Amino acid sequence: EDQVAVDNPVRLIDAFIDKLDLQQLGFQKGAERSEGRPSYGPQVLLKLYLYGYLNKVRSSRKLERECIRNIELQWLLQGLHPNYHTIADFRKLHGVALQSMFRLYVHFLGDAGLLGKTTIAVDGSKFKAVNSKKNNYSQKKIDKHQQFIKEKAEKYLQELDELDKEEQTQSKEEVQPKRDKIKQGLEKLKERTIKYDMLQQQLNNTTDKQISTTDADSRSILITKSIVEVAYNVQNAVDDKHNLVVQTQATNSNDGKALHKAATQAKQNLQLQKEDSLMVLADKGYHTGAELQHCQQENMI
């Protein structure tokens, strides 16, 4: 207790989570097992989750290690140290509940008089995804791979024809290793054909022009004028009184289609009614006629 200062932010996390009705927000305790340790309560994992994001520690494995060696976490979790599987599953299963908790936190800030609720600024930030460029596919990329497979298969078949001719002058024992190697190559091409046929089907079933196989919602995005990365475009809305974030949402679209949705969600989080006016500041990347019209119709100017 003495090793955690009274003004340490970890105490705010502890007090805030302890006051929440987590079940009402949608957080569920893990299923009890007949053997092994009892499951962790959602408040333990939620405190760990928030601590990780506050201190820029997102990896489940790193959080597991921090639970053991970090004094602040030892205090916050009362000596408990969940494994990385439990931490990762908690995040995966409670996406909607975490959004509800964020809205409740914005309400808490408003009740504390920390929000002006008259002016917000909206801007986007690019965050690199776990998904690599290698595992991001467009129609052009799939076509390129399928064409390569087709050409490689034709080459293998030509080589088999040549081996048939060689058997007339060479023994079967001399030719067979080459034939086996070609057949192995054809089997690998068959597997790759199935892979890219499945990717093509996924691409056909989405309205986007690309798919990502690791982070499904991430997209290939222009980060700067010449650098493209597989990333998320995170929209943030900040209240002007104390520069506190009142809305955040990871998207895969560009800024031009994001203003109305970000501003509307921020207005809801601020507990403002549709007829209440809200000034929204944004750079020229958001200035599309349809988005501005939608905002104006809902008293966001």
Regions flagged by a language model, labelled:
Residues 5, 9, 36-44, 59, ...:
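Secondary-structure capping and boundary motifs in well-ordered enzyme cores
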Residues 5-50:
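Basic, short loop/linker segments at the boundary and entry of helix-turn-helix/winged-helix-like folds
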Residues 24, 52-56, 71, 263-270:
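Structural motif corresponding to the C-terminal cap of alpha-helices
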Residues 28-34, 44-52, 87-88, 243-250, ...:
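Glycine- and acidic
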Residues 39-98:
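Short, positively charged, Gly/Tyr-enriched micro-motifs
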Residues 88-300:
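Polybasic low-complexity intrinsically disordered regions
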